Amino acid sequence: MVTILRPDEVKAKYGPMFCQGLYTIVDEKTGRVRIIEKCSAHGPAEWDVVNRRRTGGVIDKVMSEGTTIVMDVSLGEKELNFGPASAELGGQGICACRIEGNEVRTTWYGIAGASVGVGACLPGCKDVLRTEYPDDFKMGGGHTAHVDIITPKLVRVIIGIDDTDTKEKGATWATSLAMAKSCPYGIFMEHKIIQLNPKSPTKTTNCCSTAVSFAVRVEDISKLIEYCFDYIKRNSYSEDAVMTVFQGLSIPDELRDFGWSAKSIMYKVEDAEKVAADCGVQIISVTGTGGIIGAVAAIGCADLGLEAAGVPEDFE
């Protein structure tokens, strides 16, 4: 018989623990899932990354960004290289990931101290819907434990924004960040300032657009887009403001190449519109159309890391 506990019940049983966030972001077109875990300290994040990398299973890639763990995971089930931590074995891992309607089920294994992580720390996180424990569950000491953690199915939505300001007023980066932090739908994930071609004759001053990403439930996507549109419209000083929308974990190569080359090439609006149509980017005129190139390029640069903020010469 399986025991099912909600996060509040886990906390009542084991006490408060340390996981501050656990998000499962799904891209069903590509069969990819990204799991993002927010830890309270570097120590557990670093140990978990190293051990999950050894363990393998359905984890294809795992890295840490400060105290945040980011994992790219395949759907399905795979055998683990699991056991007491060694050069060949990892002490914690995920052997299965499945989509069940609007939920994601992941099966976690942990041994000794790592069993506390999968048995109490992760299940007690507020973002978890429920955790299923087997009858013989024991954690800590030298015990091996496994649980199924069920979380909401989330989708990554990237909003590109450009031309909300004028030479007299406003800043697109500030407007977009305020929008993201105030948005009641989804989870605000990232804010990126995108440096565009500084030689553009239509630039305000620095020639930057912005990309903001959210992890959001499917049923809230339209509400998120509507909120962002209304916010930009209310807070734009320009008659050229444009927003773009992209859903998914993988930026198409054509779109990424356009974003990068927009830092040095003078594109026409028609070029941006073609790339957007080819790559599934929705272009929305908020107060005008002048920001189309920058807003499309913002999506293309959203996953470029530090390169998003610079021009090609910065990285030669």
Predicted segments with their positions:
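Conserved mixed alpha/beta catalytic, RNA-binding, or beta-rich assembly cores of soluble enzyme
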Residues: M1-E316
